Each structure stands twice: as C-alpha cells, then as structure tokens.
Amino acid sequence: MNVIEILIVLGIILVSVILHELAHGVVAYFLGDRTAKEAGRLTLNPIKHIDPFMSILVPVLLFAMNAPVFGGAKPVPINTRNLKGKEWGMALVAIAGPLTNFLLALIFFLIGHFTGIIYNFNHSMFFFLRECVVINLGFMIFNLIPIPPLDGSRVLYALSPDGVRKFLAQMEIYGVFVVYFLILIFGNLFSGVMAAGVNGMLDFFLKLVGM
C-alpha cells in the first residue's frame, strides 16, 4: 500500500461517512425534527462530521491490515420526540444511513460494470472504483449490526416487543463498548463475517447485471 492509495481510501471514507450521517439528518428533518439542522449538521463540511478515531484511524488501520473497512462519523443529533411516527420515524432515520452507503456502492459498481473498468485490474481507475464499492458495503453492513448505538438497533427497536425494546434501551450506554470488545477479542471472526457480507453483496450486484 502506497501513499496515494492511502489518500484515495481516506477520501472515500470521509465522503462515505459524511453522506451517511447527512442522510440521517435530512430524513429526520423531513420527518419533523430540526435538531440536526439547528446544530449545523445538514452540511457537507467534513469538519462538522469527522470523528478522528472512527472516521480516519480505524478505517485506515483496517485497510492497512487488508481487513474489511468500516467506521463512522460523529452521530447526527436526533430528537425522537419531534419525529413523525416516533419509533418508526427513528427506524426510517436510522436506515437512511446504510441505504445511502448501499446506493453509493451500487452506483460505483454500475459505473465500473458498464465501463468495464471493474473487470480490468490494470486500469488506472480500478482501485478507486473497487474501494468505493467495497468500503461503502463495509459501512452498510457494519452499521446494520443490531447493537446500540448502531443503526441496525434502531430498526430492531421499531420491530420488537416491549421486552426487547427495554433491553436495547439498557444497552445504549454500553453498546459501543460491546462493539469494540467484539472487534478486539473476536477480530478474525468479525472480519470473516464482514468479508462474507461484502462478498455476498458483490455477488448480488453481479447477478443484477446478469454476470
């Protein structure tokens, strides 16, 4: 891995996490919550969104270790009491982030497919397009893990009975430590599951275009 590749990956990561968080804020705004807008988070300004640890250090280290890349940005502030639909509104806000990463991955895959670049390892744009697809799929899958405070837990909360909702609410404080624990203690297993998820989505994309 050279300096140029690191800079390319870092650029893709920053754009991907910013659009992910921006999607949360935009959907919340249209569902009645102006918190993100009033906090100045409905912007493409990276300074407003970047978390040095989760937006830069973790993803770059994972890339350097040839592991599936994932990460995050500063969470967009959301006041669920302002949202239309309450729990279901929160689920829509939550799913907007991973859906954005899915759409970004699909768009770049289709660009690579129809230009033939993604099948030409020697093309100057191959690395860029491949990483756009793989990094966004990694972000999508990671954020769909149903452990608070990840987006998947918000969707699970909306779909669950009161007992599960209570458990998820209690986990909110400790959830981020659970995620870090799983990554640190079961790193190889976690990377394997992430890689399987990314490969499964790539197979799905290939089937979409008849490959």
For the regions a protein language model found, what residue spans apply to each?
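Hydrophobic transmembrane alpha-helices and their immediate loop junctions
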Residues: 1-211
